[in-house]
């Protein structure tokens, strides 16, 4: 990840990649015995290197009363899977007054992910309160800080992924990590530099990794430049 993006991933990104790319074990989906499955480091690495082409890995921020929408194109040859993971704020401590496996919600900032296609909404996995039962994909998950939506047989078409939240976000915002696999794209741009603050007479150089499949031409254009600013592009920077 450091070699590709020039930065170290957050803990939530590492956790999200590990859960997202794990090989399923035990019951279908997450379960109390195997969790998200068996770690697959090769698939996690391939998800990082394919970022922007057949996968998406990013670190995002959600503000109070905000929702964020991503429109992606599924390859149609493998499941479309989208996951969000976040490091939640500390909740109320369990001082031993709760029974084992007590279902009382401990989540502080409750984020949500949905995938939509036309009028159909796809929900994330949710563990059943009965530990021996399989996880379900038919209702909201208000318990976990890892949410994953999986469409086993998507079509080669566009799907809308929406990230939102319920209730009040403590501190007014919540960082989260997004991982998506099962995508197709003809090119990608992955930033490798941070935000810059410069004076009006200075140049700002933003670097990125540009990847392209096929022989088509990609045209870049700047949007929202300050008055008097001029932008130029090459294969590695703006």
Regions found by a protein language model. Give the residues of each.
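Short solvent-exposed strand-capping/beta-turn motif centered on an Asx-Ser/Thr pair
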Residues: 75-77, 87-89, 166, 199, ...
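C-terminal edge strands of extracellular/lumenal beta-sandwich accessory domains
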Residues: 10-16, 68, 100-107, 114-117, ...
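Secreted peptidase-domain scaffold signal
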Residues: 37-109, 178-189
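Acidic glycine-/aspartate-rich tracts in secreted/extracellular proteins
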Residues: 23-26, 87-89, 119-120, 168, ...
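Long beta-sheet-rich domains in secretory-pathway and surface-associated proteins
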Residues: 173-238
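Short proline/glycine- and polar residue-rich coil/turn motifs
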Residues: 62, 138-143, 152-154, 200, ...
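Surface-exposed beta-strand/loop patches in noncatalytic accessory domains
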Residues: 103-143, 231
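Hydrolase catalytic cores
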Residues: 1-28
């Amino acid at each position: 990840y450091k070699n590709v993006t020039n930065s170290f991933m957050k803990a939530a990104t590492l956790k999200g990649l590990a859960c997202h790319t794990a090989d399923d074990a035990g019951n279908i989906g997450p379960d109390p015995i195997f969790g998200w499955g068996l770690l697959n480091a090769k698939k996690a690495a391939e998800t990082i290197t394919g970022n922007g082409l057949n996968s998406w890995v990013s670190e995002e921020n959600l503000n109070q009363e905000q929702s964020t929408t991503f429109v992606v194109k599924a390859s149609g040859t493998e499941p479309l899977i989208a996951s969000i993971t976040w490091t939640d704020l500390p909740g109320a401590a369990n001082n031993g007054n709760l029974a084992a496996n007590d279902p009382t919600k401990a989540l502080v900032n409750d984020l949500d992910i949905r995938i939509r296609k036309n009028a159909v909404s796809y929900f994330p996995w949710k563990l059943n309160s009965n530990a021996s039962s399989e996880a379900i994909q038919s209702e909201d998950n208000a318990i976990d800080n890892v949410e994953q939506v999986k469409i086993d047989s998507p079509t080669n078409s566009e799907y809308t992924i929406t990230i939102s939240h319920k209730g009040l976000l403590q501190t007014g915002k919540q960082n989260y990590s997004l991982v998506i696999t099962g995508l197709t794209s003809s090119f990608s741009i992955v930033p490798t530099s941070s935000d810059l603050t410069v004076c009006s007479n200075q140049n700002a150089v933003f670097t990125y990794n540009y990847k392209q499949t096929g022989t088509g031409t990609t045209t870049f254009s700047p949007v929202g430049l300050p008055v008097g600013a001029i932008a130029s592009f090459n294969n590695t920077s703006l």
